[in-house]
Amino acid sequence: TEVDLEFNANVVTHSDGYLLHGIGGWQNCLFSKTVILPIPLFRDRVPVIRDQVTTLCGPGELIDVVVTERGIAINPLRTDLIEATRNSSLPIKSIGELKAEADRICGLPAAPSLEERVVAAIKWVDGTVIDVVRQVSAAP
């Protein structure tokens, strides 16, 4: 799983580009009134919040809140949630602050090395292709 600075999410590939598993009904859940993604800030010393997701599975405008063990980021599009939590004791941070914390702890992650060959297509619930998965380059 990855989330980027625009709240886009990836649930189908690892950060190294390798396929993880199918999406299943995950995208359908993005049509909920409030979508909350609970994620670790990093996994195996690899930050989960990235500048850009490796593979787009869900658009950021449908993801409202990212909850990590080190803080909560609310999508700026959800001004109602920002206002509702303004005077709370919740550890609210920007998605950028959470990313900076993960990068400070883990270092900047390497971008995956990918070939041009497409090995999978990521489709939206209506069948529209929203991204592709490319073959990971062989190790030198």
Can you name each region flagged by the protein language model?
Residues 1-140:
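Conserved phosphate- and dinucleotide-binding cores of soluble alpha/beta proteins
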